[in-house]
């Protein structure tokens, strides 16, 4: 996202640079190891979830200036949904539409997961607030919003470094990303102006977070950042 703003002398900005979500680290058979999931090549086989990416924000105490939504975490067989140009988060994606979790709208997080969820991912946070808490430690935790300083959600217990691989595992990225579940679990939604959804069961990839622009000449592209991490760049045009 890109825009032009008029800022006055002594304006103090809060800037959040979104972080990528964590890889799955759970390995089959409970091996104790310090190797990464990529080095082992076992976590994808076990279908554990991954963390959703965090959104990037610039705001002050009275105004929200701009937001770039984070992408959802990938799952076995499905890529996470990119951060969106528009304001709303997207739904999770996976082979069974019954287990899709809806993205948030209007600055709110992805929809709450219900008690019948089996290894759900954590929903992405929105500007207005964070989502619901996970329903058990095997699930991914929701990402935090501004009141909790945008901390990414925790990973499911066995996907957090307790069952092979280094901690903290499949955590959500800083900027409100949701954490990935353990075992055959779903991945986290991306944080953003509105949060991405997370699936309720296996092989659900996370939805992307929404974006926002409150300035002049706004422009943006869905999935427009090819880098792993978010970025906030401020260029002074004139005094």
Give names to the regions the model predicted:
Residues 1-138:
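Secretome/extracellular-domain signature
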Residues 17-19, 197, 236:
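Conserved "cap/hinge" positions at secondary-structure junctions
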Residues 137-187, 191-205, 211-215:
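Extracellular trypsin-like serine protease catalytic domains
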């Amino acid at each position: 996202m890109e825009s032009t703003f008029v800022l006055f002398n002594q304006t103090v900005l809060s800037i959040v640079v979104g972080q990528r979500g964590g890889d799955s680290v759970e390995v089959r058979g409970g091996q104790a190891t310090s190797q990464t999931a990529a080095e082992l090549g076992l976590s994808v086989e076990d279908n554990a979830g991954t963390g959703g990416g965090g959104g990037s924000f610039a705001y002050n105490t009275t105004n929200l200036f701009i937001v770039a939504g984070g992408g959802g975490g990938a799952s076995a067989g499905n890529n996470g949904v990119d951060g969106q140009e528009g304001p709303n988060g997207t739904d999770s994606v996976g082979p069974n539409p019954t287990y899709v979790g809806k993205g948030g709208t209007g600055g709110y997080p992805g929809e709450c997961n219900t008690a019948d969820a089996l290894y759900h991912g954590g929903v992405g946070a929105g500007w207005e607030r964070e989502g619901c808490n996970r329903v058990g430690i095997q699930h991914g935790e929701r990402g935090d919003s501004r009141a909790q300083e945008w901390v990414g959600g925790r990973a499911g217990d066995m996907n957090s470094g307790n069952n092979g691989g280094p901690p903290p595992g499949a955590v959500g990225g800083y900027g409100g990303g949701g954490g990935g579940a353990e075992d055959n679990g779903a991945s986290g939604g991306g944080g953003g102006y509105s949060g991405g959804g997370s699936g309720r069961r296996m092989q659900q990839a996370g939805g992307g977070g929404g974006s926002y622009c409150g300035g002049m000449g706004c422009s943006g592209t869905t999935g427009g950042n090819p880098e792993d991490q978010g970025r906030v760049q401020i260029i002074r045009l004139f005094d």
